[in-house]
Regions:
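Long, contiguous bundles of hydrophobic transmembrane helices that form the permeation core
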Residues: 2-53, 330-486, 591-682, 710-719
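Conserved, well-structured core domains of diverse proteins
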Residues: 2-142, 148, 152
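Interfacial loop-to-helix junctions that mark the boundaries of transmembrane helices
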Residues: 65-74, 96-102, 136-145, 202-210, ...
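Hydrophobic transmembrane alpha-helices that form the pore/transport pathway of multi-pass ion
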Residues: 235-303, 309-316, 322, 546-580, ...
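Membrane-interfacial loop-to-helix junctions in multi-pass transporters
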Residues: 144-149, 201-214, 240-254, 285-291, ...
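Transmembrane alpha-helix interface/packing and boundary motifs in multi-pass membrane proteins
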Residues: 163, 222-226, 257-266, 298-304, ...
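Membrane-water interface regions at transmembrane-helix termini and the short interhelical loops
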Residues: 62-66, 86-97, 152-168, 319-326, ...
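Core transmembrane alpha-helical segments of multi-pass membrane transporters/permeases
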Residues: 112, 156, 160, 164-165, ...
């Protein structure tokens, strides 16, 4: 571990620059990183407030029973309050401990507009659509309906928060939808504001509901998982596993990004975090800078489709499709495997073409050092286990978070102290394994989980007090709560804005209009509808966060594919989910690729095109499961042989396409062979026995011809 940390530090220092340079890259390509500068006492206060926000989210979801119509605006009000504290009016503000008066006013007013709803819930609900007659203030002869005023102000302040944290693209999209409500559907101001602000189909709809529960808790879990040091462990394991192979550092980037992507749902964040280590290593091995940046960007973007934590959009998918999240995880396994396999094969063929070697084994981490650290993945194992046996996502996330706390404290100790700090795991493991056996109606049945949690927490506190562990442990826990709370802000704002779009679609019946338009435009052909949906997803994704992109597509295009074209509902939503993600590496606005290019010091557009070429699987796989649902374990044909045949043909197809794109199979090839391999690969990924055999024949012919050419070269060399 120490050897690899040394290697990592050298890579960052020599190629990327200082950690300040890495932060600068994050701020350039990731709006969430552009925060105010707080120092000293104000920084400590803000740190505690944000940590308390994270703690409140856990307590609210686990132990406080609250009406959904009260919980959602309360959550969004707190998010708005913190957004104005963290994010300045314009990018790059460097004033220390400074928050202008207008930000203070907007923070207070915005929070109040949303807090007013839960504080007066019964009266507002009873008023129904007659909100203009409730809470009326009379000024002379003018009657001012406060609820409409609060709705307008609250919505506008939400838009300003979105501009600061997320960006303008989603605001422009929302503005078009709102204009349609007024000008296209002929709705009046009262109707629009009532539906957008006071119902559970608009701003306070399903997206913000899922965000305030599952997404928020999993974001906090992700922050704690990072605090355990599991990301470094993943990178070390990837180095030990494939670092020695041909073009090792690129393969390390693929494997480590796939693993680290389970922890973080940000394409740009993953690219910068793991890329600061892997990109310099790839360049040092001999990969061109634009290719090195592209490998990391494509791999990090794929982290959002990697089970078990697939980014915020996956939780929304579970809610919108009405499928348990456990099934979402299972159905995403094969597509994710094929995606990363495609990238892995691409970097392999590129390494062979360039004649690149791996890293010396003596420079790589040793398994005898890594295996004792296997406990670091315990929270992930527990999370998956609890979800699979039927715990709610919220419960699984909270208990897995507590495992993270224990694991983080263990990881910072040495020798026997590790065993002492592991004692709280005993009641936690007991609860995890036995809670489903607690008999309903008994004390343990009603309170067993809470009791085990309380015992574990008490042991944790006692351990900390008696053992006097590493002084960094407690600050690390506070930092994790702070990071978790802060990471909830951008997702919350994006979900709120996407709720405006979803609200307009519901209120105006726009969804049915779009279904009719696309069905007519495609003339009933599914492939045309799929291509149009893909283009919409990619265009929207150019600047719109994955979560918001998915919500927009799930409320507009997914119903078109499902209702209008007869596509399976799960396949339709997964199709939109995939193409919303690949927008991060698709030119011209490919933020993850641009972040990778900044670290690699390569041309941004060349890096983006290389990333698109490497991630070609992401543009093919959705079409495979759209036409053959067995790939995502949906339908009546889900049998072992049918799934196995799809995986085998898709794997061979990915290999053929990757080989053709990189220009190497077992030797350099001419353009005609490259085109033939890409065409043959596409035939193999198209469902059907005839196309599979035709594609396989092309691959075999090219392989045989290359072997013949190799023999000719050897014969000529021996003469």
């Amino acid at each position: 571990m120490a050897e690899n940390e040394k290697l990592n530090n050298v890579a960052v220092d020599n190629d990327v620059g200082t950690m300040e340079d890495v932060d600068a890259i994050m701020k350039k390509y990731d709006r969430e990183s552009n925060t105010r500068v707080w120092e000293g006492t104000p920084r400590k206060i803000l740190r505690v407030l944000t940590a308390l926000f994270g703690i409140f989210l856990i307590v609210m979801n686990m132990w406080i029973k609250m009406d959904e119509r009260a919980r959602r605006p309360l959550f969004l009000g707190l998010v708005i309050l913190l957004v104005f504290i963290y994010y300045p009016i314009k990018k790059g503000s460097q004033k220390v401990n400074y928050m202008p008066w207008y930000d203070i006013v907007m923070a207070a007013v915005g929070a109040f507009c949303f807090f007013f709803y839960p504080l007066n819930l019964e009266k507002i609900v009873s008023a129904g659509t007659r909100i203009q007659k409730a809470f009326v203030v009379q000024i002379g002869s003018i009657s001012i309906p406060l609820l409409i005023v609060f709705a307008i102000i609250g919505t506008l302040i939400l838009v300003e928060c979105c501009r600061r944290v997320v960006g303008m693209p989603i605001i422009c999209v929302a503005a078009v939808f709102v204009l349609y409500a007024f000008l296209g559907a002929g709705k009046d101001l009262k109707t629009v504001m009532y539906n957008l602000f006071y119902t559970t189909t608009g701003i306070l709809g399903t997206p913000i509901g899922v965000c305030s529960t599952y997404i928020a808790l999993f974001v906090i879990f992700g922050a704690f998982l990072e605090a355990t040091g599991v990301a470094n462990f993943f990178i070390d394991c990837a180095n030990a596993l494939v670092g020695w192979a041909s073009g090792g550092p690129a393969k390390v980037a693929v494997v480590s990004s796939a693993l680290c992507g389970m922890v973080s749902g940000s394409s740009v964040g993953n690219t910068v975090t793991t890329g600061s280590v892997t990109i310099p290593m790839m360049k040092k091995t001999g990969y061109p800078p634009e290719f090195a940046g592209a490998v990391e960007a494509a791999s990090s973007t794929g982290g959002q489709i990697m089970p078990p934590i697939m980014g915020a959009a996956a939780f929304l998918m579970a809610e919108m499709v009405g499928v348990p999240y456990a099934k979402i995880i299972v159905r995403a396994i094969l597509p994710a495997f094929l995606y990363f396999l495609g990238i892995f094969l691409g970097v392999h063929f590129k390494a062979k073409k360039l004649g690149l070697k791996g890293l010396p084994r003596e420079e790589l981490p040793k398994w005898k050092i890594l295996l004792p650290q296997i406990y670091l993945i315990l929270p992930l194992v527990v999370l998956v286990y609890m979800i699979m046996i039927g715990f709610t996502m919220a419960t699984a996330a909270v208990y897995a978070t507590l495992y993270c706390v224990v694991v983080a404290m263990i990881s910072r100790e040495e020798g026997k102290k590790k065993l002492v700090m592991a004692i709280p795991l005993i009641p936690l493991l007991f609860m995890t394994l036995m809670s489903r056996s607690f008999e309903p109606g008994t004390f343990m049945g009603e309170n067993g989980s809470t009791l085990c949690l309380a015992i574990a927490f008490a042991l944790l506190v006692i351990n900390y007090a008696i053992s006097k562990p590493n002084v960094k442990s407690l600050p690390t826990i506070i930092d994790a709560f702070e990071n978790g709370g802060k990471n909830c802000l951008s997702v919350g704002i994006a979900c709120g804005m996407a709720g405006i779009i979803a609200g307009v679609v519901t209120m105006t019946g726009l969804g049915q209009v779009l279904i009719g338009a696309i069905v007519g435009l495609s003339n009933g052909h599914l492939i045309i509808a799929l291509v149009l949906t893909m283009l919409c997803c990619i265009v929207l994704g150019m600047g719109v966060p994955t979560t918001a992109n998915y919500i927009i597509m799930a409320t507009t295009c997914a119903p078109i594919l499902a209702s209008g074209m007869g596509l399976n509902l799960m396949a339709a939503h997964m199709f939109c989910f995939y193409f919303g993600i690949v927008a991060d590496i698709t030119p011209p606005v490919a933020l993850a690729a641009y972040a990778g290019s900044a670290i690699a010091k390569a041309p941004p557009m060349k890096t983006a095109w290389n990333a698109t070429r490497l991630a070609i699987a992401a543009f093919i796989i959705p079409y495979i499961f759209a036409y053959n649902n067995a790939l995502i374990f949906v339908g009546n044909d889900v049998k072992f042989l049918s799934v196995a045949s799809i995986v085998i043909s898709a794997t061979l197809g990915m290999a053929s396409i990757a080989s053709g794109l990189m220009g190497y199979l077992i030797r350099d090839m001419k353009w005609i062979s490259r085109i033939a391999l890409v065409a043959g690969g596409l035939l193999m990924v198209i469902p059907g026995t005839v196309t599979d055999l035709a594609g396989l024949a092309v691959l075999v012919v090219v392989l045989v011809l290359q072997r013949i050419e190799n023999k000719k070269d050897k014969a000529a060399a021996s003469v």
